[in-house]
Curated annotation (Swiss-Prot):
Keywords: Cytoplasm
Residue ranges with Basic and acidic residues bias: 154-163
Biased composition (Acidic residues): 177-186
Transmembrane annotation, as ranges: none
UniProt-annotated stretches for the region Disordered: 143-186
Name this polypeptide is given: Restriction of telomere capping protein 5
Any single Gene Ontology cellular-component annotation: cytoplasm
Record-linked Pfam families: TLD (PF07534)
Record's subcellular location: Cytoplasm
Length: 642
């Protein structure tokens, strides 16, 4: 498994360099307490064969709580997929020639560091990008020395290690490598280069990269990737200290149908019609980096479970035996009932018909929490019900009362049927818009003209039947008063990502699509029009990688009959102890505004506009009612924007 004379010139073999890197990872990327827990988790479960301690696929799946083929009661079967990924990553930075690796403690140290992105303390020049490593761990890349058969002695030694190791080699058939005209970018190997530079072993990398250059010309099988996607969707809300079975123990038929639907929607983004033999690296890199930046975040919290051992109780005396502690702990864990998973949705005036758990997981793969660079489920944010056509009716008056009084970011979701007149075939579609800035009432001059920072950009997206994400435009030139992120008018309805015409007394003009994506909802909240273009950088939203890669320059237009329209407010977790001033909470501010409006309405009842009032009193009363929006229609007061 070594690299011959070329490595001997450097004075170190790949095995020795891999050992040194694992030691540096262990000492610099974990705290002493984390490393103690890690060692206890590993060595208390490891198989010992001829002095080599390692984990099999069964041990890995059982510890993480990941269903595999032995769990007949669970429809998920992601254990073998995770095992092949871990076996590949365990050979880092020589995964081209040494993968699949035996899961020794050193290999598992590298796996946890890579999947939890802790390598920055050692690999300072490395770009925080795991896309290429993750692709290699899922694709069939011929990992034993450019197609040469494995050593017979090695087969004899590993014969009894794991019956599932054979499934790792043959159970995930991926089509033969194909040339995708992909131009290799040296920057994509930053992780490997940084690792070997830290070990003064660049010559080893040059040899290793020549051995198997087809590693990134291979493809990921759709079946393998679907199994991983379904697991990621199920465990997306998982925290570092939660048991995985909390999310996998109650996968009934309805829940699994929803999970499969979300997984198929994500798979559709990779344009499988043009590459039926699997997912190429170019497609994988473009979609994951540009459209699903948080897709693999659940693996971070999953593998952080290795850094907490239930066997260790630091309050106990050192005289206690380890076996007794393990047995007692295992018995307590098995007897303790699993609590229900917490929901990101807060109770309120309605329950969502769109936001099922699998849809929320899908959202967390590309939406970040406001002002933080973590996904929606990791940023301590909650969704408060603000408006729903099911609960509040299809009325712009009700929309205005509930949405324009909400002083925080919102998430707008729409579900409906695509009509026959659309460019795409008929079927159900789910769209949405992420709007970090709150809606504002008043003339267009009140809409923000300054550019948004990178963490407060809006986005327009499609959840199903095909994942589509149009990110917010960072260019200062597109943030104009007549092109707000979202606009509301009692005359024309709701416009997202559109150009708003100037007000006119004689003629009513409709908002027009602008840039790469727009959504227009009519004043009755019964129909909508969705525009998606592969070109156009002059609007609020940029082209989606899923649309751009199709090669067409035509703008697709979809007419939609709306079933349900929902608006959810973004608020911090109310249970957060750092929230000491409830007046800054959007929920409290909205209630205070409603109370004020109720008091003003009560006060207006005493006004008599017909009898006993002079001209000045009449004008004052009329001004009050116009200000409240109850009568009159002053120019510029019929709309609101963001």
């Amino acid at each position: 498994m070594g690299l011959g004379q070329s490595t001997e010139q450097a004075g170190h073999s790949p095995e020795q360099l891999s050992h040194v890197l694992a030691e540096r990872f262990a000492t610099k990327c974990f705290t002493p307490l984390e490393l103690t827990h890690f060692k206890d988790n590993f060595f208390s479960r490891a198989i010992d064969q001829e002095g080599i301690k390692y984990w099999s696929e069964k041990i890995l799946s059982d510890f993480l709580g990941i269903p595999d083929s032995s769990d007949s009661h669970c429809p998920l079967d992601a254990g073998p997929v995770l095992f092949r990924m871990v076996s590949y990553l365990g050979a880092f930075p020589f995964q081209n020639t040494m993968a699949p690796s035996v899961l020794t403690f050193e290999a598992m140290v590298k796996v946890v560091v890579l999947l939890t992105e802790r390598y920055g303390k050692v690999l300072r020049r490395a770009r925080r990008d795991r896309v290429k490593l993750l692709f290699g761990s899922l694709a069939d890349v011929g990992r034993r020395g450019a197609g040469q058969p494995p050593d017979e002695n090695a087969d004899n030694k590993e014969e009894d290690k794991s019956s599932t190791a054979k499934s790792h080699a043959t159970g995930f058939a991926v089509d033969d490598p194909a040339n995708d005209n992909y131009e290799d970018d040296e920057d994509d190997d930053d992780l490997v280069l940084a690792a070997l530079e830290s070990l003064d072993a660049i010559d080893v990398f040059k040899h290793d990269s020549r051995v198997d250059k087809t590693v990134y010309e291979a493809r990921i099988s759709v079946a393998t990737f679907r199994r991983l996607l379904m697991l990621l969707i199920v465990i997306a809300p998982l925290s570092s200290l939660e048991p995985v079975k909390k999310y996998t123990s109650d996968l009934n038929e309805e829940r699994m149908d929803n999970v499969r639907q979300e997984a198929d929607s994500i798979l559709a983004a990779f344009d499988l019609n043009k590459s039926a033999d699997g997912i190429s690296f170019q497609s994988f890199s473009e979609i994951v980096s540009g459209s699903l930046p948080y897709l693999f975040d659940p693996l971070t919290t999953l593998f952080e479970h290795l850094l907490f051992s239930k066997n260790l109780d630091l309050s106990q005396k050192r005289g206690g035996t380890e076996t007794t502690i393990v047995a007692d702990t295992a018995e307590e864990v098995s007897e303790s009932p699993l609590s229900s998973p917490s929901s990101i949705m807060l109770p309120g005036s309605f329950e969502s018909t769109i936001l099922k758990p699998s849809a929320i997981s899908h959202l967390s793969f590309f939406l970040s929490s406001p002002a933080t660079d973590v996904n929606l489920l990791r940023g301590n944010m909650r969704l408060h019900p603000v408006f729903s056509t099911v609960a509040h009716g299809s009325s712009l008056t009700s929309f205005s009362h509930n949405v324009l009084t909400w002083n925080s970011g919102t998430l707008l979701l729409l579900e409906g049927a695509v009509t026959e007149s659309s460019d795409r075939g008929v079927g159900t579609i789910t769209l949405g818009a992420y709007l970090p800035q709150h809606w504002k009432s008043g003339p267009l001059a009140h809409s923000p003209s300054r550019p948004f920072d990178s963490l407060s950009l809006p986005c327009l997206f499609e959840l199903s039947p095909k994942h589509l994400l149009m990110q917010g435009n960072t260019s200062p030139s597109v943030h104009k008063p007549n092109a707000p992120s979202a606009y509301f008018s009692t005359n024309t309805g709701i416009a997202i990502g559109c150009q708003i015409p100037p007000p006119s007394r004689s003629q009513q003009f409709e908002p027009t699509p602008l840039g790469a994506g727009s959504l227009i909802i009519d004043a009755s909240l019964e129909s909508a029009t969705f525009y998606a273009s592969p070109i156009g950088h002059n609007g609020v939203f940029l082209p989606s990688p899923s649309v751009s890669k199709n090669g067409s320059e035509t703008t697709s237009k979809m007419q939609i009959d709306i079933y349900t329209l929902e608006v959810w407010g973004l608020v911090p977790d109310p249970s957060d102890e750092t929230l000491t001033e409830p007046g800054h909470n959007a929920i409290e501010r909205q209630r205070a505004r409603w109370d004020f409006e109720a008091r003003e309405a009560e006060r207006r009842r005493s006004l008599n506009l017909k009898a006993g009032a002079g001209d000045s009193a009449m004008e004052g009363a009329r001004w009050l009612l116009e200000t409240a929006g109850l009568i009159g229609d002053r120019p510029g007061r019929s709309g609101g924007s963001m």
